[in-house]
Amino acid sequence: MATVEEIRKAQRAEGPATVLAIGTANPSNCVDQSAYPDFLFRITTSDHKTELKEKFKHMCEGSMIKKRYLHLTEEILKNNPNICEHKAPSLNARQEIAVAEAPKLGKRAAQKAIEEWSQSKSKITHLVFCTTTSVELPGADYQLTKLLGLSPSVKRSMMYQQGCYGGGTALRLAKDLAENNKGARVLVVCVEITVMSFQAPSRNDTDELDVLVGQALFADGASAVIIGSDPILAIEKPLFELVFATQTLIPDSGHVICANLTEAGLIPHLLKDAPIVISQNIERRLVEVFKPLGISDWNSIFWVAHPGGPAILNQIELKLGLKPEKLRAARHVLSEYGNMSSACVLFVLDEMRKGTIEKGMGTTGEGLEWGLLFGFGPGLTIETVVLHSVSIN
């Protein structure tokens, strides 16, 4: 008869959780950032708010975003006028759109990851779905399971309302699932559609400027990864190993990044203090996770950072003395896609591996061995994942 310890050991993988494939997707509607202020103020009949519009133009110009992908087209907004009216009850209309579209966008990203993985979807044992877009029972994880045709026995975990740190949280959960369930293959899907947080300009030129910041930054996208330990090297291609993952709260900072769900949708509040608060607290997190590896030079690692906004990236770079190229992948994703909340950091991970493979830099982490995946969001919550790159043959 087997002992409890023998049973526990047999259930666990031997090696670390590994990223085996990545897929991303966006809505077809691409919006030029320079044209967005005119669109937002016209569609919400706010063109008469000239001073507020100039402030919003300045926000968009300073966002370092070239374009974004948004599900909300002019046609959809015209068919849902309450969404375009400041603080008008519109939650039902927003929810109806989000519930229908989030699983579909997630499916597209998941299919790309499964195709890259080149294995049968029947081998997926776990599903982690993360979104701030909608809430329903059964959830988006259930809908995606049906859309993909996954096994009815797939073990699902649904994560709602995580915000921008959700991608890191989903990876941390997937790491635990893969390493504690021998042979597990975990599909992680993060989907964000800004239908819930789209907001018309306020009636006052000075009120709720922090809400407008979100309108200048947030965008729609879905990302998916497949995670598993002990990859079968003949048929699976490892990209990154997840060596260590942790989450922490910055004390007394819950007001810095937050959002309120109301009858008028999800109202985001992003205070101007966020870049300073984040940059002042990141180094102690780095020391904590990299001390066992003897690493204290932050330019010696590769960076997969959530691109919350240019001011945040600039402050992190300044505080840690990072070389400009260290945050290249994050800045590229911000420029080409905007801030896609939980889905965003996995776009950066994808850009990291694509860029380094194209340049033939030796490893999936810009030729370096060790790296950091870093996410932050409401709480203020910080997710840190230590990555180990894989050699490029």
From Swiss-Prot:
Keyword Acyltransferase set for record: yes
Coiled coil: none
Active site per database record: 164
Domain of life: Eukaryota
Enzyme Commission number, as recorded: 2.3.1.74
Pathway per the UniProt entry: Secondary metabolite biosynthesis; flavonoid biosynthesis
InterPro entries: Chalcone/stilbene_synt_C (IPR012328), Chalcone/stilbene_synt_N (IPR001099), Chalcone/stilbene_synthase_AS (IPR018088), Polyketide_synthase_type-III (IPR011141), Thiolase-like (IPR016039)
Keywords: Acyltransferase, Flavonoid biosynthesis, Transferase
EC main group: transferase
GO molecular function: naringenin-chalcone synthase activity
Biological role stated in the UniProt entry: The primary product of this enzyme is 4,2',4',6'-tetrahydroxychalcone (also termed naringenin-chalcone or chalcone) which can under specific conditions spontaneously isomerize into naringenin.
Family that this chain belongs to: Belongs to the thiolase-like superfamily. Chalcone/stilbene synthases family.
Protein name: Chalcone synthase G
